[in-house]
Amino acid sequence: MHQMTLAEIAKGLEAKQFSAEELSRALLARIAQLDPQLNSFITVTEDLAIEQAKAADARRAAGENGALLGAPIAHKDLFCTNGVLTSCGSKILTGFKAPYDATVVEKLKAAGTVTLGKLNMDEFAMGSANESSHYGAVKNPWDTSRVPGGSSGGSAAAVAARLLPAATGTDTGGSIRQPAALTNLTGIKPTYGRVSRWGMIAYASSLDQGGPLARDAFDCALLLGAMAGFDAKDSTSVDQPVDDYLAALAQPLAGLRIGLPKEYFGAGLDARIGEKVMAVVEELKKLGATVKDISLPNMQHAIPAYYVIAPAEASSNLSRFDGVRFGYRCENPVNLEDLYKRSRGEGFGAEVKRRIMVGTYALSAGYYDAYYIKAQQIRRLIKNDFVAAFKDVDVILGPTTPNLAWKLGEKNADPVSAYLEDIYTITANLAGIPGLSMPAGFVDGLPVGVQLLGNYFQEGRLLNVAHQYQQVSDWHKQAPTGF
């Protein structure tokens, strides 16, 4: 059963080949057996899962028949889950059990999904390797000496290892797409405002967006359809109807205009990844797409701009974690200042502290104009590049990552080298457009991802292109040995 996609699970449950409870018990046993090799879960919610699975079976017995009714998933551990530890991968949230469900959790629960647990992640979603978690590094099931990507590394590793069919993630600078690429999954970051951020603990409020990771575009469409939509509780949510993503999948690609940005294929890209990307382009041409070269000239400024804006927002967002109201508190503080300093000093990890300091510096009176305002101006130029490009093309295609999954610990001494791994993904967050990564083959046994970028609220088109490619390829069906 663990090899089944969400679509196959829905058919099996409908045909009464197995119950949601049987499926959940089988996957919980698999998690107990295999996750010690990966460390993808922070919390396994066994009792909750069985309770939800029984409820899903009862709903089905009463005649209900939703596509996600009884589907087992797990949530990245920054979505608040009522009564369950929500840690953000940080010591500072030790023991914090949210008193409510995030909107994403609520919507998926209403659709009948079964929550198997909370997934490991880079601390407060800051990282590209899932090595900064207080709960330990996550390992890539394709090679357990390598990183799975980040920050949604637990989500990616668990789905890739067939511990569960799909999971939620979040993407601030590539945190769904990059791990999807490094673990052979399909993952989509929706348009900013498409999925509610209420109850999703913030890293950088103007960049964060939740989305699904799954094995194929069909399953992503299923999940995104349930996750997306306006939420009055989230002031950044956009009140626009949600497309029928499943209906969009079948659209033929004849006449689709694909743009290849020259900036995505220059220095820094592993040539073997470039070859895999061009092989995907050739397949899409056979399916009727046309291809043209384009330019996104301001992409070169994306990483510096992102690493001013995101830490600036993080330094503000993370100021609420002070040892007073919830989570970790230092022992025997001598006064209030000592409580703040030591609780935060002991509670946050090195990467989070680094970004808080960078962000506080960028927002300080003497440097605000030189850094923060300048970064926001660059952000507007990047957005303008995309607006211009989408006048001539429907989808922009390129590699998701410049390199294959690297060895655990390899980039720890040089954080900038890890930041550069997000070079192709960050621009979508700065501009707020949707982006998807899909499997495109293997180099030396390690997965390669291709990224598709679309215009605002064109998630359906990205899922359509990925689905059509997955009808003529089987990369997405390959599973790691030993899992």
UniProtKB/Swiss-Prot annotation:
One of the Pfam families matching this protein, by short name: Amidase
Keywords: ATP-binding, Ligase, Nucleotide-binding, Protein biosynthesis
Gene Ontology, cellular component aspect: glutamyl-tRNA(Gln) amidotransferase complex
Reactions catalysed, as given in the entry: L-glutamyl-tRNA(Gln) + L-glutamine + ATP + H2O = L-glutaminyl-tRNA(Gln) + L-glutamate + ADP + phosphate + H(+)
Active site: 76 (charge relay system), 151 (charge relay system), 175 (acyl-ester intermediate)
MF terms (GO), sorted A to Z: ATP binding; glutaminyl-tRNA synthase (glutamine-hydrolyzing) activity
EC numbers, comma separated: 6.3.5.7
Domain of life: Bacteria
Protein's job: Allows the formation of correctly charged Gln-tRNA(Gln) through the transamidation of misacylated Glu-tRNA(Gln) in organisms which lack glutaminyl-tRNA synthetase. The reaction takes place in the presence of glutamine and ATP through an activated gamma-phospho-Glu-tRNA(Gln).
Subunit details: Heterotrimer of A, B and C subunits.
Name this polypeptide is given: Glutamyl-tRNA(Gln) amidotransferase subunit A
Lineage: Bacteria, Pseudomonadati, Pseudomonadota, Gammaproteobacteria, Pseudomonadales
